[in-house]
Amino acid sequence: MPPKPSAKGAKKAASKAKAARTGDKKRRKRRKESYSIYIYKVLKQVHPDTGISSKAMSIMNSFVNDIFERIAAEASRLAHYNRRSTITSREIQTAVRLLLPGELAKHAVSEGTKAVTKYTSSK
């Protein structure tokens, strides 16, 4: 009696047949960009012995994207009000001051200034 074909074998055969139909080209998986590696690096700097679940990472990624979009939109609005066609670090700084509350804005501005200084000095 011959062995029964497993579900895995059937799936492999189906995928091979599909690849043959599409002109023998394997479809490359589309790259999904995220901030997860940077969030993980910051987590390890702050709490070296703490991990993060994929759900929590997804939430953090959404949070970073949301804040990025808010700052970009506010900076764009500020540039438009002042009839400027370029968003500079000044617009970003003002947008951060407008969007973030009190002490958080002060820390964000100082960290941003530090990052820009480090970048310009390394050039």
Curated annotation (Swiss-Prot):
Record's Pfam families? Histone
Which one of the record's GO molecular function terms can you name?
Answer: protein-containing complex binding
GO-annotated cellular components: nucleosome; nucleus
Indicate which residues are glycosylated according to the record. S110
Which residue ranges does the record annotate as region Disordered?
A: 1-32
Instruction: Tell me which UniProt keywords the record has, alphabetically.
Output: Chromosome, DNA-binding, Glycoprotein, Isopeptide bond, Methylation, Nucleosome core, Nucleus, Ubl conjugation
After translation, how is this protein modified? Answer: Monoubiquitination of Lys-118 gives a specific tag for epigenetic transcriptional activation and is also prerequisite for histone H3 'Lys-4' and 'Lys-79' methylation.
Under InterPro entries, the record lists: Histone-fold (IPR009072), Histone_H2A/H2B/H3 (IPR007125), Histone_H2B (IPR000558), HISTONE_H2B_site (IPR055333)
Top-rank taxon:
Eukaryota
Q: Where is this cross-link: Glycyl lysine isopeptide (Lys-Gly) (interchain with G-Cter in ubiquitin)?
A: K118
List where Basic residues composition bias occurs: 9-32
Record's subcellular location: Nucleus; Chromosome
Keyword Ubl conjugation in record: yes
Residues found modified as N,N-dimethylproline: P2
Q: Which residues form a coiled coil?
A: none
UniProt subunit comment: The nucleosome is a histone octamer containing two molecules each of H2A, H2B, H3 and H4 assembled in one H3-H4 heterotetramer and two H2A-H2B heterodimers. The octamer wraps approximately 147 bp of DNA.
Q: What does this protein do?
A: Core component of nucleosome. Nucleosomes wrap and compact DNA into chromatin, limiting DNA accessibility to the cellular machineries which require DNA as a template. Histones thereby play a central role in transcription regulation, DNA repair, DNA replication and chromosomal stability. DNA accessibility is regulated via a complex set of post-translational modifications of histones, also called histone code, and nucleosome remodeling.
**Protein family membership:** Belongs to the histone H2B family.
Protein name (database record)? Histone H2B
Q: What is the lineage of its organism?
A: Eukaryota, Metazoa, Spiralia, Lophotrochozoa, Annelida
